[in-house]
């Protein structure tokens, strides 16, 4: 039965295990929600605004089905966009987006209809009636979200995180420090960003010393607002020792507008990653490394719509073990590190790294891998090579608030099924299985990030 009680559960032990974890609170240490939207607590106007307006997963699949861009990110009305989505939605079968959006519809709206061209109008009208009462804060409480960490630039004032402490009841909203723009000396707009950091924190950031002072002040500012983790997007990690004088010379050259060599770019990035590690060591923050996303690969899309519009891809040819060796040994036992990889063929590398370094944790299946298929493969491999018990937990990685419940439910069902299979095969006693799924679903990630 579609999305029935046994959805994704193929054995009796799995059903029993899922029933024990399905109602646990959600702790999400990595997502892309905007704290401002949660604090302002305005209801959505329509189902497209909820499900399609910010979701590049939806945009990509609509494009794959031949839908014109004006019905995706263009000037058409939200209703026209929803109808265009519903028309092609049956083609999404097998992709987790098909299940997530149906789960949202069934669990949150209690509308048990299959999305199609025939049902699109009814769903539009029924959700329209219910949305005025479904404010962001109410939904977060209904989904039992206990803690969530947004992703924020070091220049941020964190004004809405501060307001959330008083305005948002029952949910803790924390920032995550994401200093990618500080490190990416080769990107357009780097100097303007560095100047902005100087203005924000009262430092002369034309010099490396001033820029590092500004970053330290930002780090402290985030700490004061409850931050527990940093996050770093690395296409290919390449961290090694770089003398501070070398980094200082590169910084000044880049700030003056001179073109850098590739070696200078690499040296600057390596130096900055080590500085970020030192900052996190001071505050005992978790360092999250998201590895292997080749961003803005489709040029026309990036030029038209900018980043995060559905033009990013996964790439295989990365030297992760070599590139992280210095960083991991420099902070061996000193820094909690979580590794996420986009290409599943890199899972053996990060799993064995975690096995070698007790302070390193394998992150949840990420992005293109957070489907039932990808999660099952990830969990089974991790259990066989490292410790499933030590998985860093589920993250939604979502820009869409409504998907917290559906993404977490899917993960907990797959986890319960994987562990349930082990019970059925006689590999694990039921008592240990119950403790394992509870730990991975809630206790473990809460202790790692927030303990």
UniProtKB/Swiss-Prot annotation:
SUPFAM superfamilies: Metallo-dependent hydrolases. Disulfide bonds: none annotated. Its EC number is 5.3.1.12. GO terms for molecular function: glucuronate isomerase activity. Signal peptide: none annotated. It catalyses: D-glucuronate = D-fructuronate; aldehydo-D-galacturonate = keto-D-tagaturonate. Pathway: Carbohydrate metabolism; pentose and glucuronate interconversion. Keywords: Isomerase. One of its GO terms (biological process) is D-glucuronate catabolic process. Belongs to the metallo-dependent hydrolases superfamily. Uronate isomerase family. Homotrimer. This is Uronate isomerase. It comes from Thermotoga maritima (strain ATCC 43589 / DSM 3109 / JCM 10099 / NBRC 100826 / MSB8).
């Amino acid at each position: 039965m579609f999305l029935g009680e046994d959805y994704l559960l193929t054995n009796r032990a799995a059903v029993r295990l899922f029933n024990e974890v399905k109602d646990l609170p959600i702790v999400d240490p990595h997502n892309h929600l905007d704290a401002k939207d949660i604090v302002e607590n305005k209801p959505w106007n329509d189902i497209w605004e909820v499900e399609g307006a910010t979701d590049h997963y939806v945009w990509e699949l609509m494009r794959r089905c031949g839908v014109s861009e004006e019905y995706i990110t263009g000037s058409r009305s939200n209703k026209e966009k929803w109808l265009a989505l519903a028309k092609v939605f049956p083609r999404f079968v097998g992709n987790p987006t098909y299940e997530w959006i149906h789960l949202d519809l069934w669990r949150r709206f209690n509308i048990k209809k299959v999305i199609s061209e025939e049902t699109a109008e009814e769903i539009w009208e029924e959700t329209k009636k219910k949305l005025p009462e479904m404010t962001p804060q109410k939904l977060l409480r209904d989904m039992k979200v206990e803690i969530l960490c947004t992703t924020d630039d070091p220049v941020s004032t964190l004004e809405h995180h501060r307001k959330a402490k008083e305005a948002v009841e029952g949910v803790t909203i924390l920032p995550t420090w994401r200093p990618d723009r500080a490190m990416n000396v080769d990107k357009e707009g780097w100097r303007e960003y560095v100047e902005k950091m100087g203005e924000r924190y009262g430092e002369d950031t034309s010099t490396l010393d001033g820029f590092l002072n500004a970053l330290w002040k930002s780090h402290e500012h985030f700490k004061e607002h409850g931050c527990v983790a940093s996050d770093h997007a690395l296409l290919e990690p390449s961290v090694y020792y770089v003398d501070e004088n070398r980094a200082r010379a590169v910084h000044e050259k880049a700030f003056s507008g001179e073109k850098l060599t590739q070696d200078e770019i690499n040296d600057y990035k390596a130096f900055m990653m080590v500085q970020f590690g030192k900052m996190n060591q001071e505050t005992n923050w978790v360092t999250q490394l998201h590895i292997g996303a080749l961003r803005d690969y489709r040029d026309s899309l990036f030029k038209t719509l900018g980043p995060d519009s559905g033009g990013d891809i996964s790439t295989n040819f990365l030297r992760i073990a070599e590139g992280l060796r210095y960083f991991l040994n420099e902070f061996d036992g000193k820094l909690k590190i979580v590794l996420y990889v986009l290409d599943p063929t890199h899972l053996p590398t990060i799993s064995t790294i975690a096995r070698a370094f007790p302070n390193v944790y394998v992150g949840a299946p990420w992005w293109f891998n957070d489907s039932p298929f990808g999660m099952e493969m990830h969990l089974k491999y991790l259990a066989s090579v490292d410790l499933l018990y030590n998985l860093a937990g589920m993250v939604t990685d979502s820009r869409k608030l409504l998907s917290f419940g559906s993404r977490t439910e899917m993960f907990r069902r797959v986890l319960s099924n994987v562990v349930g299979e082990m019970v059925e095969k006689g590999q694990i006693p039921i008592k240990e299985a119950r403790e394992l799924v509870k730990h991975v679903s809630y206790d473990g990630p809460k202790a790692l990030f927030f303990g």
